[in-house]
Structures are given as C-alpha cells and as structure tokens.
Amino acid sequence: MKTIVIAEVGENHYGRWDVCRGMVEEIAKHGATYAKFQTYTADNFGKDHIWYDWFKGVAMPEAEHFEMQQLCAEKNVGFLSSTFTIGTTRFLVEKMKCTSLKVASSRLVDYDLLDDIDNRADKVKTVYLSSGMGTIDEIRTAIEHLSKIENLYLLHCTSQYPCEDENVNLRAMVTMQEAFPDYPIGYSCHNHGIEACLAAVALGATVIEKHFTYHVDMPGDDHKGGMTPEMLGQMVQSIARIETILGSAEKAPVDAEKRAVDNLRVPMLDVGFE
C-alpha cells in the first residue's frame, strides 16, 4: 500500500497510559503507517482557556512520549506527533530525534512556529500540514514558511468535530492539487465512518489521517468522527484495493482482454430486425 495512513490517538486515551499503549498495539496490528499523538502542556493554552482542565488531564508527559515512541518501534509502526509551540518542536526534534512532524490546522498561520520548523530542516525531513479553517492563500503562505522542508504534505481538513457530510468538501482537494502541483495532497478526516477517506484516495490523496477510538460513542468529539480497530483494518484493506483498481492513466487494452478481443471483435451478420 502506497497511501500513508495516520491513526491519531490524540486525546482519546483520556490520560490513561494503559489505554494509550493498547491503542498503539491495535493501530500497529491493523496496518497503519503511523500512530499519532499530540505534544503540548495545558499551560501552552493558558489557564484561562475554556478547555484548560481537559488539556491538563490528557496532555502526554515527556516520559510517556518516550514510552510510546519505544512501543511504536517494537510494534513496527511509525511514531508521529503534532507540535504546537517552538518548545514542543525542540523537544520532539532535539530530545526525541523525530524527523517527521505534524502541524495541526490550528497552527497553519503560526508563522513563528513554521519558521522554527523550517530552520530545523537539516533534521526535520517530513512535515504533514493540515489546512482546516484555511484558505488557498493561507496555505500558500504556509508553504513559503516551510520552503526548506524536503517532504511537505498538504492535508485538506474541515475543523468540525465530528464533521457533517455537507462540510467535508472533498473537491477542495482537487483545488489544492491544481494550486500546488509540486506537493502531495492528503486528507485529515473528522467525518463519520471511512467513506470520506476512501473517496479521498480515489481523488488522489496520498495521506489519510483519522482519529482512533475503541468506540465512536465514547465521550468526546474526537471519538464520534474516529475509527475503531475494525474500521481501521477495513480502511487499510480497502485503500490497498482502491490503489489497484485505480491502475494507471494509460488507456490501452490489457492482457486479460485478449479473450474478449478474439471472441467479440468479429464480423457481425446484418440479419434480423427487418
């Protein structure tokens, strides 16, 4: 399978690291490319933030970062995390030696953060940039601030949790492909089910990101638009099949059509229907 599949644990562990470990194991078992996390502290958002107490309960401490990174290595699945500040970038790159980073939609116009990542291009080789709430011009400006990054992926996203069907707007991916032909385009999904992800692959997405959960009815917005282990497994298998079905852009007969050529491209007798 060529498509990169990012299964985001995010905050869906509720601050229980035994649950987090179990999620990593399931993500690896069902074939994702990455298990993804979020690197921040509640204080990064400020004590007056409406969700401060929630962030305090689910923020992943440094020790657990290293534990999950080690577990990912043992389970043969990539470790990836979203960075939100220059400090969290420094931690991920300098301490954890991460060469790939995720930039969340909320940081699309945080040019100080993007510049700092760009200045670390000797160590940061890949960036996955989500574009929720963004415009084409804002994406273009973000690209300019990440000009040194060797592998920059642009992810279409709608920052609604969960995202209603009428707000998914997958055709925006085509607009992004036309506007930025030099960059691979992907899709970060908050929609119910896996249908939008599969449609995105059919439209040319090279990366699919979706939250991971044990049950979509668990409390919290990231669960409702998430995927269970079974859904992840089904999505990975379906993406692999879609890649085969898409084939190449060449319009020419395939070897399997030889029998049809021999038996159907024959002279027809002009009889009947008089």
Provide a role label for each language-model segment.
Residues M1-E274:
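Catalytic cores and adjacent flexible loops of soluble metabolic enzymes
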